[in-house]
């Protein structure tokens, strides 16, 4: 079963948020969706945090005519992993994004114009502090769990270290304690693609800089896949539409990247892409601490980690560093390495594999809370 027709909600907070940079952002609007019902004890809420270019549309459809359901529709609904007959599921669009929450494309109330590059640099920790405003607004003192993959996993880690008293558990998939130099360099090249598009106009564009953003998305998309998955899907097949010896003839993988890149332009804002890429690069769960050990000493709730064998963006060794650190500290931690050909995107695609493990973990958390 599915959650059916859903609606996007939003709330605006008049309070100003002091960011990690020291700058102030406010008022803040957050777009979000909820599924299921909050129980009388307000103890069954699970926050699902989205990745870089995701949004609050986690599951269901806005109308019968919507072509695709929410981005993790397979795990949300009656009888599914995130069972809406048991849990109250929340997903909020992060600040800095472009799907209804305050970001660079929003109107700055002080000027009446779009923020564009006057928008402050934000961090994953800032995103979580904004989420905390929403959780307070919903009247929830303590989340049963926070779950997310990639940048969503970073948010879950921030909840576990910055607000340990407010979560009963965390589920972290395909993430890292800090992006590597290689990951940062790939984001840098993606940024250059946008910067060097003359229609970007230093962020003051009226229409999305389509060529730069499409190229940036193509670079990013490669990092989400694996050699194995790309070989299986495309191999070295040349496009049937192009002549093999045409100068501009393309392999199927080239056509795929172009198609996805230019489709992306229609749904995502270039400045938001840049700001969230910066937030990813700046991420370090140990920011403000002397070490990872000191950061993880704050953890109180059990954390379940998943890594995927072919993920070369945030490889398993980076998850294992976190698991080992938590184990040394005597913290409750569980780790699963899943063999998968899907690369970094495996956290979205291997739900049938990890569902029984997550379900068992949540049952243990529930039993321990009794």
Curated annotation (Swiss-Prot):
Entry annotated with the keyword Phosphoprotein: no
GO molecular function annotations of the record: homoserine O-acetyltransferase activity
Origin superkingdom: Bacteria
Residues annotated as domain AB hydrolase-1: 44-350
First-tier enzyme category under EC: transferase
Gene Ontology biological process: homoserine metabolic process; methionine biosynthetic process
A single cellular component GO annotation: cytoplasm
InterPro entries membership: AB_hydrolase_1, AB_hydrolase_fold, HAT_MetX-like
Keywords: Acyltransferase, Amino-acid biosynthesis, Cytoplasm, Methionine biosynthesis, Transferase
EC number: 2.3.1.31
Binding site for substrate: 217, 345
Residues annotated as transmembrane: none
Subcellular compartments: Cytoplasm
Active site: 150 (nucleophile), 311, 344
Pathway: Amino-acid biosynthesis; L-methionine biosynthesis via de novo pathway; O-acetyl-L-homoserine from L-homoserine: step 1/1
PANTHER family for this protein: HOMOSERINE O-ACETYLTRANSFERASE (PTHR32268:SF11)
Self-association state and partner proteins as the record states: Homodimer.
Family: Belongs to the AB hydrolase superfamily. MetX family.
Function: Transfers an acetyl group from acetyl-CoA to L-homoserine, forming acetyl-L-homoserine.
HAMAP family, A to Z: MetX_acyltransf
UniProt protein name: Homoserine O-acetyltransferase
Name of the gene: metXA
